[in-house]
Amino acid sequence: MSTTNNSRLDVIDALRGFAIVSIMLLHNIEHFDFIFTPSGLPGWLQAIDKVIWDSLFFLFGGKSYAIFALLFGMTFYIQYHNREVRGEDFRARFAWRLVLLLGFGMLNSMFYHGDILSIYAVLGFALIPVARLSSRWVLAIAIVLLLQPYAWIEFIHALPNPDQKLGDPASWAYFGIANDYFANGSAAKVWWGNLTNGKIGVIRWSWENGRLFQIPALFMLGMLAGRKGVFKEGNIIFWRKTLVTAALVFIPFYALKTWPEAWGIGPAVQRPLLTIVTSWSNVAFMVVLVSTFYLLFYSRAWLAIFSPLGRMSLTSYVVQSIVGTSIYYGFGLGMYKYTGASFALAIGIVLAVIQRQFSVWWLAHHSQGPLETVWHRLTWIGGGSMTHAKN
């Protein structure tokens, strides 16, 4: 696919590439989950760091991964439909594809415990039973999941004693342990810690923050977007309406989640409600980003610069984990000690440019990225022709 030809797949590739870049920038200012503020920074630089931190998390925190999840469901639909028109059922092959993704995810988790691939691999199985349901049923299931049912159960359970004191979320203990080996551990200790302590911590954090309900819901919405063909060129009116609606939904939820102390309720009921409101706020703003990107893509050709990264998203995601942790963790360059958000953002931009140029060079000689090629070939092992949809 040409990165300058504004076809349907190009906008998906470009949007996926945009998500990869924004994820990289967030990971850099977080030092790849090793959040640390260097000492001795001048006041003016601390002020700039705070603006950068707050701005990037406002724009991308909880949204970039959601774009990725939406497009994961979209990609499933494309692959499923391509096999369906041949009279084949893709679901068993997709299950095998998810097993392979879990392998890539565990490899990536060794370097970076915040890996999302392994979680996508497990939750992706939710797409298999809904693949043949009507769009109305799929939408209903997605809405129920987006409502965060477990958080509502917690809220109801807390109503008799709303002022009960709550301890720290369980995930915090795991992250505290991780900070020690991020700073002082050898590479081997970090890698083992990420696969054990870190992985448990991330799963607990994902549960505490409603991600384990939100992710499959976004997969299903992405599948529905594929069915409706909303990413095809010519859907300007749909996306304009979607942008306005999402913005109107986002504003009150963002205000609520930003000032929870104004709610005037006890901590036991505030925590689950904050999980719900934050989840809804992030999804709404994710839709704002997707809508805006679509509307700009067909009028601003330069946005296609993200397409090469989108076509190599698996490779790009894993490589950024390997390189980034080597830059910031103690076993590598230990840059966590010296870089606030400003300098870490600069490092992230440089890495994104390098990854983009590498992707352009690689795709000039190959049809897919290196890890994408391995994933594709293993997906279709024993499946005959290799001429299958590669999006």
For the regions a language model picked out, list residue spans one by one:
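Alpha-helical transmembrane segments of multi-pass integral membrane proteins
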Residues: M220, I265-A364
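Membrane-proximal soluble regions of multi-pass membrane proteins
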Residues: V51, A364-N391
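Long hydrophobic alpha-helical segments that form multi-pass transmembrane helix bundles
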Residues: I143-L221
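Juxtamembrane membrane-water interface segments that cap and precede transmembrane helices
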Residues: W44-F58, A187-I203, I265-P272
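Specific transmembrane alpha-helix
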Residues: A66-H81, S118-P129, G210-G234, S281-A301
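Functional transmembrane helices that form membrane-embedded active or gating regions
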Residues: S7-L15, A19-I20, T242-A246, F297-V323, ...
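N-terminal signal-anchor module of multipass membrane proteins
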Residues: M1-F72
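Solvent-exposed interhelical
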Residues: E88-D89, A126-V144, L224-T245
